[in-house]
Amino acid sequence: IRDHCVTGVQTCALPILGDQGTVLPSGARVRVRSLQTHGRSLEVAQPGSRTAANLVGVQKDEVSRGEALVIGGWMQPSPLFDVRLRVLPEAPRPVSHADEVHFFCTTFDCVARVRLLEEDVISPGEEQWAQLMCTRPAPLTHGDRFIIRALSPSETIGGGVVVDAHPGRRHRRRDPQVLEWLAALSQADRAGQALLRLGENDQRAANAIV
């Protein structure tokens, strides 16, 4: 039997014994055989708890650090996402448009290129809207927090929050409509985000017809 035990912090959907799930971004299909937290067996994992899950259908060498167990298919990994990016006041240098940085979110990490959407530079202590283009798809969702480090020397220079994990395209820089959209999306709950995306899709369809 192919099985493997994985650990991590539960964030959203609640795994239940026997659930079918997917390990992302690898795409491996698995079944939850057992759940534990702090040595205690569970039938349902609760959000915020550090959980160990025994998965049937995958072996150790098929799962990498930083991957996510997803129940219900609600998450899709993407190499491009929209963020609110802040540079630490004590950072030794600013972050410039097209800089490459080391990106960390929970246990996921990769190299990412920064696309600044407002100005060409974020000085220490400042923030702005940006896109991050990762070297591999990242299993992220709205509200995930992250940090960035310089590639060399490796030191933390900033961080932020994911606003849209699936923008689908690179935004035009310094576009007022894009900046307003990101501000609205950052303040909306999940239902509000869905309505905003429906409105955006309707507008794209209208533009295509015109």
Listing of model-derived features with the role each one plays in the protein:
Residues 10, 28, 38:
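A generic "binding-loop/recognition-motif" signal
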Residues 1-12:
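Single conserved hydrophobic/aromatic residue that forms the stacking wall/gate
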Residues 47-51:
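Membrane-interface junctions of multi-pass transporters
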Residues 10, 20, 32, 114-116, ...:
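Conserved hydrophobic positions within beta-strands
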Residues 52-58:
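Structural microfeature recognizing short secondary-structure transition sites
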Residues 15-31, 103-110:
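Ser/Thr/Gly-rich low-complexity blocks that favor extended beta-strand/coil architectures
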Residues 13, 35:
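Short catalytic-site patches enriched in acidic/histidine residues
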Residues 38, 43, 58-210:
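C-terminal effector modules of nucleic-acid-centric enzymes and ribosome-associated factors
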